[in-house]
Amino acid sequence: MAEAYPGGAHAALASRRSSFRNSLRRLRPTEKPDTSFMRGVWKYEIFPSYVRVTNKQVLQLDAQCQELPPCPSVGQILSFKLPSFSFNTTTYGSRYFTVAFLFFGAEDNEVFLKPFFVMHSDQDIVLSVLNPRSLFIEKGKFTWYIVPIRLVKNPYLYLQILPGQSDIQLTRSCTQSGDKLNTSEPQIFLSGSPVTSQDECLPYLLAQHTPPFLKSYARIHTFPGKVCPVNAIRRGKGYVRVSVDTPDLKREGPLNVKVGMTLLDDVIIAFRYNPYPKSHWRWDGESTDIRYFGSPVIIPPNFITELEYNNTYEAPLSSKITAVVVSHSSNPVFYVYPQEWKPGQTLKLTVRNISNNPITIVTGQSMAQAFFIYAGDPSISTIMRRYIQRQGCALTLPGNIVVESSSLPTFERINKTFNGNIVASEGTL
C-alpha cells in the first residue's frame, strides 16, 4: 500500500500556487513562436509551453472522412526546437504529479476535433473529427493545439467518509479488527454478512464507530483487475455503514464479505462513491473512468441524450485542481462531449450515439475518462477570458477550462527533467 500524502504534498501544492501567482504578473502581448515549420498540410508553431497548428493548404473533407491528414509524433514535432526531446508520462514527475500532452481543436473550427491525451513522445497521432461532412476548409482556418498539462496522480481508491443518513440501532455488528492503530494511518478490517434496509439501495456491512473512523478519508484496500465491493462509507452516532456491491451478492446462502481500509486525514483526491461500480479497478493513476450507475438507458441511432452522473470528489489540499472529462477516443459506438468536472459537483454527461443501431447504457459501463489536472486559480478565469482575443496569452481547454500559457510546464523543462539534466521535484514539474 502507498503512503498517505504527508507534509510534502502540502509543500508541492504551495509551490504550484506561488508559481501561478507569479505567472499572472507576466501577462504579455500576443506571443511569438520560438520555432515554426511546415510538414504535409500543417504549419507548426512551437511556443515555450504549447504548439499551435494550422492548415497551410485547403482541407477537403467528406462525410466518410473521420480522420484529418496525419501529423508526426510529439517527439518529432518538438525535435525542431529540442533535437533530443523524449518523454513518457509513466516515468516522469513525482509521487503526486506527472505531465501529459493534450490535443484539442480551437473553438471556432468548422468541424470538431475530438480531444485526447498523449502519454509518450513516440505515440502515433490520429486526428479524429466528430460528425464528418463534406466541406472545404480554407487555408489557415483550422487550428488545433498540443498543450502539456499537469496531471494529478490518483493510483489508489480514496473515499470520503460521509455522514450517516439516519439513526441506526446497532444490535449486531460485523467483525472488526485493526492494525497500526497507534499511527496516523490506522488500518481497519471488516468481515461479515451484508444486511439490507429500505433506505439503502445496496446491502451494507454494519460496524461499531471506533476511533479510527473519526478521520475524514479511507484508502480502500483493492487490487488491479479485481472488483472492489465497497461503494461508500457512512458514519453515524455509534456506527459505521459500508455499502457493498459484488456479483457474489446475488447467490443464494450466507455470504461473507471482507473489507480492508486505511484511515487518513489528508488526500489529494477522494470520491463520494466508488467510481468503478461492478467493474475492475483500473490501476494506472493517470485517469479515472466515468462509469454509469443507474437504470438502463436506450439511445437511438444518431441521437443525443443527457445522463446523470451523481458521483462527486473532493480535492481538499488545493482549490486549483479540477478535472476534464473526455470520451474514449477509440469508442466506435457513442461519444461523450468534453466538459469540466469541478470538485463537489455532479455531472450531466452529453452522450451521442454515433452508430447506426440503438445502444443500451447499463450500470458499470465505461462512458469517458476524467483527467484530474492542476489548472491554476479558478477565481481568475473571467479575467483570463478577456485576454484570450486581445492578448493571446491564455488557452481555452476542452470543457471551457481557461489556463494562462505561462503557467504551463515548458517543453524545455520537461525535456531536461525527463532526460536527467534536472532532478524532478515538486516545484519543477
UniProtKB/Swiss-Prot annotation:
InterPro entries xref list: Herpes_Orf11
One GO-annotated biological process of the protein: symbiont-mediated suppression of host innate immune response
Stored Pfam families: Herpes_ORF11 (PF04797)
Record keywords: Host-virus interaction, Inhibition of host innate immune response by virus, Interferon antiviral system evasion, Viral immunoevasion
Binding partners and assembly: Interacts with host IRF7; this interaction inhibits IRF7 dimerization, thereby altering its function in immunity. Interacts with BRLF1.
Family recorded in the similarity comment: Belongs to the epstein-barr virus LF2 family.
Record's function text: Prevents the establishment of cellular antiviral state by blocking the cellular IRF7-mediated innate immunity. May also inhibit viral replication by modulating BRLF1 activity.
Protein name: Protein LF2
Organism: Epstein-Barr virus (strain B95-8)
Gene this protein is translated from: LF2
